[in-house]
A protein has these predicted regions:
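Non-heme di-metal
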Residues: 1-178
Length: 178
């Protein structure tokens, strides 16, 4: 709970966060279009402005107390994704159907299925964090340093990468899904 809870200032901060977040996304889309049309400088300026908007959004989000611990952030993200697939997109699909937009309703339902997967992923990651099983598993895994590519086989990632000296935080279970 932030010191702004229940105030008009809280609503203003939420609106500022939403507006800056939307502007950032729009400007990245605009940059892609400008690049495709051959306007490199304009694309770069859209991206620069998008980065500014991202920082503005972060400032307002932090003011609202929106950034917690990783475990808290995973729980909040899972709850948000749950709302999106169980309530928001389900309602949007129903409305689109009623208003004669079956193709859009189908897209809303497809995105809802993706949001469900996002929720499941966040909940699995939260379980790993809470059980202290992010960098240690009960069976042998192949761990890869995300910085230099060093490979380690074992039940846990090393504290420090023996090749590049980056911390354990850079290790992940090697995924070869190709």
């Amino acid at each position: 709970m932030s010191k702004y809870t229940g105030t008009q200032t809280e609503k203003n901060l939420e609106a500022a966060f939403a507006g800056e977040s939307q502007a950032r996304n729009k400007y990245t889309y605009f940059a892609s279009k400008a690049k495709k049309e051959g306007f490199e400088q304009i694309a770069a300026l859209f991206l620069k402005t998008a980065d500014n908007e991202k920082e503005h959004a972060k400032m307002w989000f932090k003011e609202l107390g929106g950034i917690g611990s990783t475990a808290g952030n995973l729980a909040a993200a899972a709850a948000g994704e749950n709302f999106e697939w169980t309530d928001m997109y389900a309602g949007f699909a129903e409305t689109a159907e009623k208003e004669g937009f079956p193709e859009l309703a189908a897209k809303f339902r497809m995105v809802a299925a993706i949001e469900k997967h996002h929720e499941e992923r966040y909940r699995a990651l939260l379980r790993n964090v809470e059980a202290q099983e992010v960098f240690k598993k009960s069976d042998v895994k192949v761990w890869e340093c995300r910085n230099c590519g060093h490979i380690v086989v074992g039940e846990q990632a090393p504290e420090i990468c023996p090749t590049c000296a980056h911390p354990q935080a850079y290790f992940e279970i090697c995924a070869e899904n190709y």
